[in-house]
From Swiss-Prot:
Binding-site positions, ATP: 174-182
Transferase listed as a keyword: yes
One Gene Ontology cellular component annotation held by this UniProt entry: host cell nucleus
Protein name: Para-Rep C1
Gene expressing this chain: C1
E.C. code: 2.7.7.-, 3.1.21.-, 3.6.1.-
Residue numbers binding a divalent metal cation: 38, 47, 94
Motif (RCR-3): 86-89
Organism: Faba bean necrotic yellows C11 alphasatellite (FBNYC11A)
Function, as annotated: Initiates and terminates the replication only of its own subviral DNA molecule. The closed circular ssDNA genome is first converted to a superhelical dsDNA. Rep binds a specific hairpin at the genome origin of replication. Introduces an endonucleolytic nick within the intergenic region of the genome, thereby initiating the rolling circle replication (RCR). Following cleavage, binds covalently to the 5'-phosphate of DNA as a tyrosyl ester. The cleavage gives rise to a free 3'-OH that serves as a primer for the cellular DNA polymerase.
Main location: host cell
């Protein structure tokens, strides 16, 4: 039986094996793709749990020929959002495109933009701006590189493996520059993290409120070190805040998240409680 929508499971041993499989999925051939990383509780076997919505119908034999014979494939049930929730219940690994509810015209708008960006720019510049931003983000998040972790990055990775709480702020400190802080912070975007360089509190809260269950990375430039926004950090970490810019909304979020600050300066103990901070030195 042929279908456009499939879910898959792939057991793997190495990160290279995992990324090689993910790289087979082409943005030009699909509407939406998402996969997460899971570990079987009884065997500790690592595996990818994924979902793909293709632009064209394909049979099981065609999938195996295109993506190899190791993955297990089944026709997907539920919509894009339900499959995304299922695939990312542990860790989001890769996402291409955006989930769309049944009957929505969101994907049609993006398709129109991709067919003729210049025409949409003339007719509806605001929509064209958002579509282009989405396109660039998709391209950025679908690129992968094998990174050799520095000691501090390995330490940070171990800390992130623990469940987040509603208090701890992880502070990555390196005064020299060139230690890989921004490189690590930008890589987190590909795993669904909210990335910000700081700024005014309401600007940060407004951007975060668009999807308020994301982990958070503050990548603070050296020139902004004297204007560190501790208020926004604590409000986001506390999971209760009001975003009053443009579309006012009060948010009370149950899901706890990690919050990392990448900075060239150490935290100021007069502006934030020291017991909240876990420092990782570069």
């Amino acid at each position: 039986m042929a279908s456009k929508r499939w879910c898959f499971t792939l057991n793997y041993k190495t990160a290279v094996e995992r990324e090689s499989f993910i790289s087979l999925f082409s943005r030009d051939e699909l509407n939406y793709f998402v996969c997460g990383d899971e570990t079987a509780p009884t065997t500790n076997q690592k595996h990818l749990q994924g979902y793909v919505s293709l632009k064209k119908m394909i049979r099981l034999g065609g999938l195996k020929k295109k993506f190899g014979y190791r993955a297990h494939w089944e026709i997907a049930k539920g919509d894009d959002f339900q499959n995304r929730d299922y695939c990312t219940k542990e860790t989001l690994i890769s996402e291409i495109g955006a989930p769309v509810k049944k009957g929505s015209n969101q994907r049609k708008i993006m398709d129109l933009y991709l067919q003729d960006p210049e025409e949409m720019q003339l007719k509806d510049p605001d929509t064209a701006l958002r579509c282009n931003a989405k396109r660039l983000r998709i391209e950025y998040c679908s690129s992968f590189a094998v990174i050799s972790l520095r000691p501090w990055q390995s330490e940070l990775h171990r800390v992130l493996m623990a469940e987040p709480d509603d208090r701890t702020i992880i502070w990555v400190y390196g005064s020299d520059g060139g230690e890989g802080k921004s490189t690590f912070a930008k890589e987190l975007i590909k795993y669904g993290w909210f990335y910000t360089a700081g700024g005014k509190t309401q600007d940060i809260l407004y951007m975060y409120a668009q999807d308020p269950e994301r982990n958070i990375a503050f990548d603070v430039p050296r020139c902004s070190s004297e204007m560190m926004n501790y208020q926004a950090m604590e409000m986001l970490k506390n999971r209760v805040f009001a975003s009053t810019k443009y579309r006012p909304v009060d948010l009370c979020v149950r899901k706890k998240v990690h919050l990392i600050v990448f900075a060239n300066v150490s935290p100021d103990p007069t502006k934030i409680s020291e017991d909240r901070i876990v420092i990782i030195n570069c």
